[in-house]
């Protein structure tokens, strides 16, 4: 048995194994913490080549998954890095300003911008709907997510010149509050796909919400809550569609946040008590009656400025 253990200890991981393990750590870093993970990985690996290759492969995926916001040079605004705005590996469209941001994924900065060309922008007909929806979503986000950013992209049918064809818009809402000095970080991400169906005159709306929080003061507690939604409304004018869609998004997101608050308010009397020992190994009883003070959802709401 000892010989087997010695053999395992002496087994050297291959280059690819090291890279895949490093990528796993990169991709599973909580919101806003990938650079802390990168610093530790670099020290642990002691192999610049493995580290660089893992980082080059993992950072773009992480940035798009977390929909990070980067400031564009010269005060041109901010761009959300996402798969919906991706033109190529390092270029991302900001439809609001009709600019393309060139991104350094590993450094997480926007190095420069260029004007978007006609092929990268939607037609005037599609832009009318995109612009109206973008304005309504901006208004909603400014009211509900003081730390939030939003974008509306056309992902299907962007070249349609008028009624008669289907097209699809995607609403992206992302909010992040980083407070590492207080040992806590939080994020909110929501993606809403709106399929404009011309023949049936119906808008099919599908949403995905994800809330994350990480607390690491004298411990490690992480929240990762997800929820899918489906709804619909009628195909109307651009302005009327925008108002209807924004109201649907507002309704579902507000209800979801309320449901999280209710679910976590029940933790002291249900889930926590079912998990606990009769008497912990510390021989000290945990104050179950006061566990609401550790409410994750309340802290996420506070950190992101939700509900204000």
From Swiss-Prot:
InterPro entries: CapZ_alpha (IPR002189), CapZ_alpha/beta (IPR037282), CapZ_alpha/beta_2 (IPR042276), CapZ_alpha_1 (IPR042489), F-actin_cap_asu_CS (IPR017865). Keywords: Actin capping, Actin-binding. PROSITE patterns: F_ACTIN_CAPPING_A_1 (PS00748), F_ACTIN_CAPPING_A_2 (PS00749). GO terms for biological process: barbed-end actin filament capping. One of its GO terms (molecular function) is actin binding. One of its GO terms (cellular component) is F-actin capping protein complex. It comes from the Eukaryota. Gene3D superfamilies: F-actin capping protein, alpha subunit, F-actin capping protein, beta subunit. Component of the F-actin capping complex, composed of a heterodimer of an alpha and a beta subunit. Belongs to the F-actin-capping protein alpha subunit family. F-actin-capping proteins bind in a Ca(2+)-independent manner to the fast growing ends of actin filaments (barbed end) thereby blocking the exchange of subunits at these ends. Unlike other capping proteins (such as gelsolin and severin), these proteins do not sever actin filaments. This is F-actin-capping protein subunit alpha.
């Amino acid at each position: 048995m000892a010989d087997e253990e010695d053999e395992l200890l002496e087994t050297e991981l291959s280059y690819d194994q090291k890279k895949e393990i490093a990528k796993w750590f990169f991709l599973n870093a909580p919101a806003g913490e990938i650079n802390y993970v990168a610093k530790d990985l670099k020290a642990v690996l002691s192999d610049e080549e493995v580290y660089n290759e893992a980082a080059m492969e993992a950072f773009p995926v992480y940035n798009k998954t977390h929909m990070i916001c980067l400031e564009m040079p010269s005060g041109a605004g901010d761009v959300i890095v996402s798969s919906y705005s991706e033109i190529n590996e390092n270029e991302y469209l900001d439809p609001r300003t009709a600019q393309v941001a060139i991104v350094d994924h590993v450094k997480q900065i926007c190095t420069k911008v260029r004007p978007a060309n006609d092929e990268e922008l939607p037609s005037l007909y599609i832009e009318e709907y995109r612009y109206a929806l973008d304005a309504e979503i901006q208004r909603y986000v400014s009211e509900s997510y003081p730390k939030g950013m939003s974008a509306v992209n056309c992902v299907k049918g962007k070249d349609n010149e008028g009624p008669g064809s289907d097209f699809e818009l995607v609403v992206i809402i992302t909010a992040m509050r980083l407070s590492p000095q207080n040992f806590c970080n939080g994020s909110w991400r929501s993606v809403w796909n709106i399929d404009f169906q011309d023949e049936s005159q119906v808008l099919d709306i599908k949403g995905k919400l994800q809330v994350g929080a990480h607390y690491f003061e004298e411990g490690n507690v992480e929240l990762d809550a997800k929820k899918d939604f489906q709804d619909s409304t009628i195909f109307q004018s651009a302005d009327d569609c925008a108002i209807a869609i924004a109201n649907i998004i507002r309704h579902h997101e507000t209800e979801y946040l309320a449901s999280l608050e209710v679910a976590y308010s029940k933790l002291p009397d249900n889930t926590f008590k079912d998990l606990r020992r009769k008497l912990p190994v510390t021989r000290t009883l945990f104050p179950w009656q006061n566990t609401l003070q550790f409410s994750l959802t309340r802290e996420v709401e506070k950190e992101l400025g939700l509900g204000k």
